[in-house]
Amino acid sequence: MAKKVAAVVKIQLPAGKATPAPPVGTALGPHGVNIMAFCKEFNERTAKDAGLIIPVVITIYADRSFSFITKTPPAAVLLKKAAGIESGSPQPNKQKVGKITREQLREIAEIKMKDLNASDIEAAMRMIAGTARSMGIEIV
């Protein structure tokens, strides 16, 4: 028989740097999950993605066990990394803060493809391009 799901928690954590301190402790503590076990497993799985923010969906079962799925980093994080900027533009239509090439846009779309609701790579590229525009990043 399948385990009974008690809760589903979604949080974004830096890859390889999960600690029992907030936000992990405050999200998992009330559910009685072994926080250190989660941190250890998460850090092992995401060590290769150091420096990126990784969204994670944690399914907590009634017997206090858990399983989790890591998603791809948010498009905004990947765009900032590709453009070499710290943050997006405060006025995206007036003030451009960075540039990326179509090739970089395609790479980001390929990374994000499995998490996007897009049927082909061109549709995914258009979605990522929209995010870039709203951040003040120009596509050349």
Curated annotation (Swiss-Prot):
The keyword Nucleotide-binding does not apply. CDD domains: Ribosomal_L11. The keyword rRNA processing does not apply. One of its GO terms (molecular function) is structural constituent of ribosome. GO terms for biological process: translation. One or more lysine residues are methylated. Signal peptide: none annotated. Coiled coil: none annotated. It comes from the Bacteria. Belongs to the universal ribosomal protein uL11 family. PANTHER family: 60S RIBOSOMAL PROTEIN L12, LARGE RIBOSOMAL SUBUNIT PROTEIN UL11M. Part of the ribosomal stalk of the 50S ribosomal subunit. Interacts with L10 and the large rRNA to form the base of the stalk. L10 forms an elongated spine to which L12 dimers bind in a sequential fashion forming a multimeric L10(L12)X complex. HAMAP family: Ribosomal_uL11. This is Large ribosomal subunit protein uL11. The gene is rplK.
